[in-house]
A protein has these predicted regions:
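Cys/His/Pro-rich metal-binding microdomains
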Residues: 7, 23
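Intrinsically disordered, low-complexity Ser/Thr-rich linker and spacer segments
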Residues: 34-45
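Residues immediately within or flanking Cys/His clusters that coordinate Zn2+
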Residues: 3, 19
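A generic "binding-loop/recognition-motif" signal
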Residues: 18, 28, 175
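Catalytic cores of transferase enzymes with a strong primary signal for eukaryotic protein kinases
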Residues: 2, 14
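Flexible, solvent-exposed loop/hinge segments and secondary-structure transition points
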Residues: 43-252
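Cys/His-coordinated zinc-binding microdomains
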Residues: 10, 26
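Short, non-ligating residues that shape and space the ligands of small metal-coordination modules
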Residues: 15-16, 29-34
């Protein structure tokens, strides 16, 4: 015959099961525990303590591993598409400098293949693209620099004379919206570069194309973006330093 002990008052009951109520303190059957031989209450079977620190740490670690695995899987699955999108965006920026804007993805791929005939890297990050635009040769040069809040870059398209600007396109990663962002978002401002000259006359000792708050050489300089002096200064320096890397080619 089994023995059951009331955890409230200590009353011991003998029988097949615990009484519905303790006759001494009226505690319910749930307050009784088995007594094993020797008089001690049967130890409770230990389960998983979901309130313990160990459980919390282990659970969190498992979730971190699962989430990391899922993110890695998704990233790996999308990598090819992401790389393709980056390359396509780069091609569109090149076409923008030729004033071929607003093209769909398919149109951009087709037009790029038609127009760009050769690509040459003179230094890491600095490339020359030789293009055939409606039977006319154009050269596109990549440049890069720093704006107020982050990196800026550009594509400078020249006519076959390697002196006259055909078109430009600038990009940025984080310039002030409405001010510094004008270098990318304002086609009207970019159009100011059309027809400008890299050099002052026949003197090819230095690039004079630039962006100035007060224009002194109208044949080669463009008005700075109002309210974005530091960004404009960054573009000016980028043009002079960046295009100087192509001096050997430009002087040919």
């Amino acid at each position: 015959m089994a023995k059951f002990k009331c955890k409230v008052c200590g009353y011991v009951h003998e029988g097949d099961k615990a009484p519905e109520k303790c006759p001494v303190c009226q505690a319910p059957a749930s307050e009784f525990e088995d007594i094993v031989e020797g008089g001690d209450a049967a130890p409770k079977k230990k389960g998983l303590d979901t309130n313990s620190n160990t459980y919390t740490i282990v659970y969190a670690a498992i979730m971190v591993v699962i989430v990391a695995f899922l993110l890695a899987f998704v990233s790996s699955s999308l990598k090819d598409k992401q790389d393709a999108n980056v390359k396509l965006d780069y091609k569109k920026q090149i076409l923008n400098s030729l004033d071929l804007r607003g093209l769909s993805n398919e149109e951009a791929e087709t037009k790029y293949s038609e127009v760009v005939k050769d690509e040459k890297e003179v230094e890491e990050g600095y490339k020359i693209f030789t293009c055939d635009l409606n039977g006319e040769t154009k050269y596109i040069f990549t440049v890069k620099g720093m704006g107020l809040w982050g990196p800026i870059s550009g594509f400078i398209a020249l006519n076959a004379d390697k002196q006259t600007i055909y078109g430009v396109y600038f990009n940025h990663e984080g310039e002030t919206a409405g001010l510094g962002a004008e270098i990318k978002d304002s086609k009207a401002w970019q159009d100011n570069f059309k027809g400008k000259k890299l050099y002052k006359g026949d003197d090819k000792s230095a690039i004079v194309l630039g962006v100035k708050k007060k224009v002194e050489i109208p044949e080669s300089e463009v008005d700075a973006v109002t309210g974005a002096t530091l960004t404009s200064d960054g573009v000016d320096l980028m043009l002079k330093d960046g295009l100087a890397k192509y001096n050997d080619f430009l002087k040919q």
